[in-house]
């Protein structure tokens, strides 16, 4: 379980649209083959957003299994980058 939300060593934001019907294996495939990153990189959070910007998914490998996060906000929407030019690096 997610014990400490400040312990991420990296956070990657998948720009553009992601089909949020995908679950752990589908999101891990996107990470591996589309972004050429390792989904098993411990304490690295990968974030995805669909066409509806009121919900996002996160995937996190915790060393003993994946944690799939899902957030839907009731009012408003996330300001999600749709292109790499809109994305910022978070340090």
Explain the meaning of each model-derived region:
Residues 1-91:
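Polybasic/polar functional segments that serve as interface/processing modules
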């Amino acid at each position: 379980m997610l014990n400490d939300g400040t312990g991420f060593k990296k956070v990657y934001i998948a720009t553009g649209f992601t089909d949020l019907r995908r679950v752990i294996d589908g999101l891990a495939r996107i990470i591996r083959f589309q972004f050429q990153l390792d989904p098993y990189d411990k304490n690295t959070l990968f974030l995805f957003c669909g066409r509806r910007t009121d919900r996002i998914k996160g995937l996190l490998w915790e060393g003993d299994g994946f944690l799939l996060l899902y957030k839907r906000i009731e009012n408003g929407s996330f300001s999600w980058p749709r292109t790499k030019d809109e994305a910022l690096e978070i340090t």
